[in-house]
């Protein structure tokens, strides 16, 4: 009952074509394709935005790491001056 063969699918396709016509189905397919394309573009732009944010955060993090060793050197020189 749940298994549809090729003949059942062909009969359903013929009925759909007779009900809606080829022009309507063609325009429906074009609309569906445009929606899928828009969705893909939105997803790719979202991924690019995340990648840019990650790159920006990675660039900000090393500058903090560079300042930390300088702070350690200053404390070492203060310790030497006190001795």
Curated annotation (Swiss-Prot):
Under InterPro entries, the record lists: TatA/B/E, TatA/E
Gene Ontology CC terms: TAT protein transport complex
Q: What domain of life?
A: Bacteria
Q: Could you list this entry's UniProt keywords, alphabetically sorted.
A: Cell inner membrane, Cell membrane, Membrane, Protein transport, Translocation, Transmembrane, Transmembrane helix, Transport
Provide ranges: composition bias, Basic and acidic residues. Answer: 47-57, 71-83
Tell me the GO molecular function terms: protein transmembrane transporter activity
User: Where do the TM regions start and end?
Assistant: 1-21
| Main localization (coarse) | membrane
Extract the ranges annotated as region (Disordered).
47-83
Instruction: Tell me where it resides.
Output: Cell inner membrane
Q: Relate the protein's function as given in its record.
A: Part of the twin-arginine translocation (Tat) system that transports large folded proteins containing a characteristic twin-arginine motif in their signal peptide across membranes. TatA could form the protein-conducting channel of the Tat system.
* Family statement: Belongs to the TatA/E family.
Q: What assembly does the database describe for this protein?
A: The Tat system comprises two distinct complexes: a TatABC complex, containing multiple copies of TatA, TatB and TatC subunits, and a separate TatA complex, containing only TatA subunits. Substrates initially bind to the TatABC complex, which probably triggers association of the separate TatA complex to form the active translocon.
Protein's name in the database: Sec-independent protein translocase protein TatA
